[in-house]
């Protein structure tokens, strides 16, 4: 059984939901990322989504775009990100790590060499935001052969037929984007999310993580009542931005938010 599936199975047995933080690798500097990953696990994270910096992150709002810029100022490459995961794995073999980013850096490395390097580093899944399932036919078998789950996005506007397709094409979990627009936008309508999650459950057999619009313990708790996982990104990346000149403060700032979310989700 793969690490992501095992994680959701364990949480299900404990009647708990997955807390899934997102941070951009190499933001604000490369040395911050691995200690931050450990700090997030200590604060209650179950799965880590690690952003691979890209020069044109079109699905992301200004907060995460700036995070990519900060990481790229230090030339954080895809291989650097894989090296970070490898170091993390030296002392943590349990927490799943998902690389989230865009197709271009994967194509540049080549599907096979990327998948092999990701497997060797201890990566568990890949979420490429600009790769729809219809276009993933070539990539999927390569990732699968190296034990990597392919995670796809479901939007509020996604049709039932397409949700079924995504459920069949993906593995690990589905990422439901709870708001129209870019990351870090607008406020969350939990009733709307609950209704959509129910629809998705009837069409796809994978656990459902919900992201976009989760900013605090209250919204994390509300979403955890209806989804299998809560994805939080911009709220954490904001803290990293605020502490970019004092990197030593980042672990506590991010950990504080996650601890509060974990506590609220477990109540």
Swiss-Prot record:
Q: What class of enzyme is it?
A: lyase
Gene Ontology cellular component terms for the protein in this record: cytosol
State whether keyword Amino-acid biosynthesis applies.
yes
Query: So where's the catalytic machinery, residue-wise?
Result: 49 (proton acceptor), 60 (proton acceptor)
**A GO molecular function held by the record:** tryptophan synthase activity
Q: Does the keyword Amino-acid biosynthesis apply?
A: yes
Q: InterPro entries, per this entry?
A: Aldolase_TIM, RibuloseP-bd_barrel, Trp_synthase_alpha_AS, Trp_synthase_suA
EC number(s) on record? 4.2.1.20
**Protein's pathway:** Amino-acid biosynthesis; L-tryptophan biosynthesis; L-tryptophan from chorismate: step 5/5
* Catalytic reaction annotation: (1S,2R)-1-C-(indol-3-yl)glycerol 3-phosphate + L-serine = D-glyceraldehyde 3-phosphate + L-tryptophan + H2O
Q: Per UniProt, which keywords does this protein have?
A: Amino-acid biosynthesis, Aromatic amino acid biosynthesis, Lyase, Tryptophan biosynthesis
Q: What does this protein do?
A: The alpha subunit is responsible for the aldol cleavage of indoleglycerol phosphate to indole and glyceraldehyde 3-phosphate.
Subunit structure and binding partners: Tetramer of two alpha and two beta chains.
Q: Which family does it belong to?
A: Belongs to the TrpA family.
Q: Which PANTHER family match?
A: TRYPTOPHAN SYNTHASE ALPHA CHAIN, CHLOROPLASTIC, TRYPTOPHAN SYNTHASE, ALPHA CHAIN
Alphabetized HAMAP family for the sequence: Trp_synth_alpha (MF_00131)
What is the official name of this protein in its record? Tryptophan synthase alpha chain
- Point out the gene that encodes the protein: trpA
């Amino acid at each position: 059984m793969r690490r992501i599936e095992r994680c959701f199975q364990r949480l299900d047995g404990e009647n708990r939901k997955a807390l899934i933080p997102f941070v951009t690798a190499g933001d604000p500097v490369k040395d911050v990322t691995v200690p931050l990953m450990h700090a997030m696990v200590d604060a209650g994270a179950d799965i880590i989504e690690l952003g691979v910096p890209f020069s044109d992150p079109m699905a992301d709002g200004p907060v995460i775009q700036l995070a990519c810029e900060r990481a790229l100022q230090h030339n954080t490459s895809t291989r650097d990100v894989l090296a970070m995961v490898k170091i993390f794995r030296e002392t943590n073999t349990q927490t799943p790590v998902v690389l989230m980013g865009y197709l271009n850096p994967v194509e540049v490395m080549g599907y096979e060499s990327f998948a092999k390097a990701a497997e060797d580093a201890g990566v568990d899944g890949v979420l490429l935001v600009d790769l729809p399932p219809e276009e993933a036919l070539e990539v999927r078998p390569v990732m699968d052969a190296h034990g990597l789950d392919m995670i796809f996005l479901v939007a509020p506007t996604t049709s039932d037929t397409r949700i079924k397709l995504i459920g069949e094409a993906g593995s690990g979990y589905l990422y439901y984007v709870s708001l129209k627009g870019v990351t870090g936008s607008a406020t969350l309508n939990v009733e709307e999310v609950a209704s959509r999650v129910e629809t998705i459950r009837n069409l796809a057999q994978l656990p459902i993580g919900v992201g976009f619009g989760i900013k605090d313990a209250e919204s994390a708790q509300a979403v955890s009542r209806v989804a299998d996982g809560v994805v939080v990104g911009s709220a954490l990346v904001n803290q990293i931005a605020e502490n970019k000149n004092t990197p030593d403060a980042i672990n506590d700032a991010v950990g504080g938010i996650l601890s509060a979310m974990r506590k609220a989700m477990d109540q």
